[in-house]
UniProtKB/Swiss-Prot annotation:
Positions contributing to Cu cation binding: H47, H49, H64, H121
PANTHER family linked to this entry: SUPEROXIDE DISMUTASE CU-ZN -RELATED
SUPFAM superfamilies assigned: Cu,Zn superoxide dismutase-like
UniProt effect for mutating F46C: In ALS1; slow progression
Name recorded for this polypeptide: Superoxide dismutase [Cu-Zn]
Effect of V98M: In ALS1; increases tendency to form fibrillar aggregates
Modified positions (N-acetylalanine) in chain numbering: A2
């Protein structure tokens, strides 16, 4: 089992970053940390998408990683996509320092995120509470600013 993974985020604009993942036990939580720069100040949706395909930019990554066919939600919700990591918060300089621990994603097994795409979005994720159909699919997080395929790390 891989215990570490990394993702280099890039987009068409100024947004870029490096996100690290570490899972010490196969059924334990995954620590997610790193930094994203070039964002507007505020909240930005942060999700693992189904495919590791960036051939047409971030759009070819498909929908959120959702092997259990659930509705979109927040990272602490029972009803959520596996890939729903909530929001990252950018400061006035456009930098989001990421520090998350998640017990639904994994670096092995059915919820493995390796080979899938991590995406940072234009807007805040409403965590499935926006009151419309799009909220239950995407959290109304808007366009995909930057993305990268999650790969095994040393």
């Amino acid at each position: 089992m891989a215990t570490k993974a990394v993702c280099v985020l890039k987009g068409d604009g100024p947004v870029q970053g490096i996100i690290n993942f570490e899972q010490k036990e196969s059924n334990g939580p995954v620590k997610v940390w790193g930094s994203i720069k070039g964002l507007t100040e505020g909240l930005h949706g942060f999700h693992v998408h189904e495919f590791g395909d960036n051939t047409a930019g971030c759009t070819s990554a498909g929908p959120h990683f959702n092997p259990l066919s659930r509705k979109h939600g927040g990272p602490k919700d029972e009803e959520r996509h596996v890939g729903d990591l909530g929001n990252v918060t950018a400061d006035k300089d456009g930098v989001a320092d990421v520090s998350i621990e998640d017990s639904v994603i994994s670096l092995s097994g059915d919820h493995c995120i390796i080979g899938r795409t991590l995406v940072v979005h234009e807007k805040a994720d409403d965590l499935g509470k926006g009151g419309n159909e799009e909220s239950t699919k995407t959290g109304n997080a808007g366009s995909r600013l930057a993305c990268g395929v999650i790969g095994i790390a040393q």
